[in-house]
Amino acid sequence: FAEALVSGSVLPAKCTVSSEEGRQSIADYLGVSMGSEIKKVARLACAGGTNVAINRANYEGLSSCQAAAIVSGGGKGCFWGCLGHGDCEAVCDFDAIKMDPFSIPVVDIAKCTACGDCVEVCPKDLFSLQPVNHQLWVACKNLEMGDDILEECQVGCTACGKCAMD
């Protein structure tokens, strides 16, 4: 990123981990406009914690989502669901992700810099970077249509479309 910044192919506003004052200082130093960027935050496409989703197996290996995913996708009943071992929390340098009591990561949008580390580390590709002003997103990555997912997770998306109508 630094090379692209110095070469002029990106503006300082694209630096997600720096403060606004820091981005302005970089712009002043380089003699360029800071530019503008809509703040993004990490969003998780799973709400299936241990209180609403079943496990199909008791995984007892290394406490890591990466490791659990290698062992037949982990123990979660929902194939697409969060494995809940906290790799995302461990990789977040900004202390923006905490595991809730039901083993689901919760993102503190005030602390999230949209650095993308959680996106990279999640073996289920459940994190994405979304504009902070987008308040509606589907917190489920189930790709099947219909009610079958509800046998695995009480809050699984059935693709009914009701959320799009509201």
Regions found by a protein language model. Give the residues of each.
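Ferredoxin-type iron-sulfur electron-transfer modules and their immediate structural context
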Residues: 1-166
